[in-house]
């Protein structure tokens, strides 16, 4: 039986590729997609979900827009990474269908209520929508199998020296998610910076030759430019968000540890930092499965294999 999932995302190049991977995988049943504000403004990320589903010919999947700003802060966006549209690079279609009239939280709650089995929530943007769901519907916590997030880092940040972007945008929301008691799987920068796509991998995807693999290659062409900055020391571009979907499909290509994670919401220098109790110093019981390594070639091979689905 396919694993039921809800995807909450803020497309964003890597979010878009995570959608491509999920919808090419019969092991997963994508029951709903909600948009969050993060990589771009809420209007643009919602539009980008609709554009991607139009491209992938999946107007059957319910879509709803989420919160327009973080729980307690003003919105920060990453237009320097993802461009003015949030998906700069390829020519994507205009949406062929409209989102549902309700909110992301309403769609998530409805999906959980109606599911015969617990649902996995995959969150590849700030945690605002998921935190609002958890706070407003405590009766539905048992309907959530786990929450798989792209966010955080044990070591170095990518938006501040201490903080990864998704967590930094809404640290209060992330803290709610980590302390919810629901199993959390964290794909942080420690693993996603190892899931780099090299120039040769992009050409491999392009050579598959179907319309979707071509679009993915063009998304990566644009995404690669930001990551060529020497300060990162990257060979390619880290493909953050697809690590969440890849873990669901092939957990064996990832190395994980069970640890307690908290989010710093007030630090002068460390606001938005995910504090991972790696050496069990706090006495707190682990609340997260933390990805720490990935078989990069296995990750690339999985993407290439699933892009064949669109032939």
Curated annotation (Swiss-Prot):
One of the protein's GO biological processes = pyrimidine nucleobase metabolic process
Q: EC number(s) on record? A: 3.2.-.-
- Record keywords, A-Z: Glycosidase, Hydrolase
Taxonomically, the superkingdom here is Bacteria
Which residues catalyse the reaction?
Answer: 240
Entry's Gene Ontology molecular function annotations: purine nucleosidase activity; uridine nucleosidase activity
Q: What class of enzyme is it?
A: hydrolase
Alphabetical list of InterPro entries matching this protein: I/U_nuclsd_hydro_CS, Inosine/uridine_hydrolase_dom, IUNH, Pyrim_hydro_RihA, Ribo_hydro-like
Return the similarity comment.
Answer: Belongs to the IUNH family. RihA subfamily.
Function of the molecule: Hydrolyzes cytidine or uridine to ribose and cytosine or uracil, respectively.
For this entry, the protein name equals Pyrimidine-specific ribonucleoside hydrolase RihA
From which organism does this entry originate? Salmonella enteritidis PT4 (strain P125109)
List the lineage, top down.
Bacteria, Pseudomonadati, Pseudomonadota, Gammaproteobacteria, Enterobacterales
